[in-house]
Design a protein with these regions (language model features):
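Extracellular glycoside hydrolase catalytic/binding regions
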Residues: 1-100, 104-130
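A short C-terminal boundary segment appended to hydrolase-like catalytic domains
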Residues: 119-148
Length: 148
């Protein structure tokens, strides 16, 4: 609460936001929602659950930005989440772009001690040489971001 109070006193030019990341932390979530200029949130669930979260956040009548999404093993995919975000006018940021920088092709809780290729990349879009992990994902991202 104090951080928001201090921030409101100096009123920075950028919007204030504290990202929602754990639905179990209800008191913290209420504080964040009531004090954020824009609502930022994480969601690594499939399309039905993600839509439910968007619907529940709409009641605050503030812009929404999903600051973390896309976890292939969780059925949170570019192909089923990005169209929802586009339709709902929700900003989107996903972890990982090129394999190797942040190593998020590996799931956080499934280490591969020898560093071998995971059977399914968790995040990441491109191999280090620039080749897409899945061309259809890159095509979808381009089509959704270039269309109005």
């Amino acid at each position: 609460q104090k951080v928001f109070e201090w921030s409101w006193q100096i009123r920075p030019s950028q919007p204030l936001s504290a990202g929602l990341w754990n639905p179990v932390l209800t008191d913290l979530n209420v504080l964040q929602l009531e004090n954020s200029d824009i609502i930022t949130y994480h969601n690594y669930n499939g399309p039905e659950e993600h839509q439910t979260v968007i619907d529940s956040l709409r009641k605050y009548n503030r812009p929404l930005v999903c600051t973390e999404y896309m976890a292939r093993r969780n059925n949170s995919l570019f192909t089923n989440i990005m169209p929802i975000l586009k339709k709902e006018n929700v900003g989107a940021i996903n972890w990982g772009l090129v394999a190797g920088k942040s190593n998020t092709k590996y799931a956080w809780d499934e280490p591969i001690p020898d560093g071998s290729e995971p059977p399914l990349w968790f995040h990441e879009i491109f191999h280090p040489d620039g080749k897409p992990y899945k061309q259809e994902e890159v095509d979808l991202i381009k089509s959704l971001t270039l269309s109005k």
